[in-house]
Amino acid sequence: MVTVAALALAPSAGADDHRHAYDAMIAAAARANGVPEALVHRVIVRESRYQPRLIGQGGVYGLMQIKLATARSLGYRGDTTGLLDPETNLAYGVKYLAGAWRMADGNEDRAVRYYARGYNENHLRLHSPRPGAPRSLLPAPAAP
């Protein structure tokens, strides 16, 4: 009877179980990019529920559901398969999230929205020298 009670109280497998497998990688990526760990976890829950091999609609990949073009704009040289590797995905996803975090002035809700909708296009539109001018990728503002 004690065994049955213990099993009934045991947590079910789900996002929380998967989360712990990536805690150390998430902490390192967050630290390297100057963003709160909780923000990274929030984006991962929203985007993939800790499913590293998830391929989403619109060509988004891995834990943070990052696009290949976005990762490449941040220096990634591999293919889409590489973005399914949790460490690689976090390296580029958190780097992109850091830009959204800075643009949101540290506001987590806005940072999540900017990350989800693609803040680079908004940044380019706001900082284009004149309407119709060719746009180049502008660097994100430096962290304070």
What are these regions (language model features)?
Residues 20, 24-28, 37-41, 68, ...:
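Solvent-exposed, polar/charged alpha-helical surfaces in well-ordered, non-transmembrane soluble domains
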Residues 81-88:
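A short, structured beta-strand-centered segment in the mid-to-C-terminal lobe
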Residues 9, 15, 19-20, 77, ...:
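Compositionally biased, proline/threonine/alanine/serine-rich low-complexity intrinsically disordered stretches
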Residues 92-133:
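Catalytic and binding regions of secreted/periplasmic enzymes and modules that target cell-wall glycans
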Residues 10-50:
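Export/targeting segments at the very N-terminus of extracytoplasmic proteins
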Residues 48-51, 70-73, 118-121:
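Solvent-exposed loop/turn segments at secondary-structure junctions
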Residues 58-76:
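Substrate-binding/active-site groove segments that recognize
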Residues 1-8:
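Bacterial N-terminal signal peptides
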